[in-house]
A protein has these predicted regions:
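Active-site cofactor/cluster-binding pocket
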Residues: 1-108
Length: 108
């Protein structure tokens, strides 16, 4: 069995609207980390995802005790919808990198 690499925790917060692929993107990142023998923790919050509601998930790479990302702890925020990006701002700190879509999804 390959040795697990020791790395500083990198906290990635994903957010979007149901049906945008938020959970799929989370799984891709988590699987890629596993294939590189990096320690990884993942968490998902589905909410009303099937009805166009918010979907939040997190991937924590490296040494961490929990997949939960508290306010101010995100290193990267990936938002698939701009209003969800705004809702995720409390997770950010001055060094957080935010990647977001600029196309809003109207509620239905």
């Amino acid at each position: 069995m390959p040795m697990i690499k020791e790395v500083r925790a990198l906290r990635i917060f994903f957010t979007g609207v149901g049906g945008q692929g938020t959970l799929l993107a989370t799984r891709f990142v988590g699987q890629a980390a596993l294939e590189e023998n990096l320690p990884v923790l993942m968490a998902e919050i589905h909410g009303m995802a099937q009805r166009g509601g918010v979907v939040e998930s997190s991937v924590v790479l490296g040494s961490a005790a929990s997949p939960t990302i508290a306010d101010g702890e995100a290193d990267i925020v990936i938002a698939f919808e701009p209003l969800e990006a705004a809702r995720a701002l409390p997770k950010c700190n001055p060094k957080t990198v935010v990647i977001t879509s600029t196309t809003p999804i109207p509620p239905f």
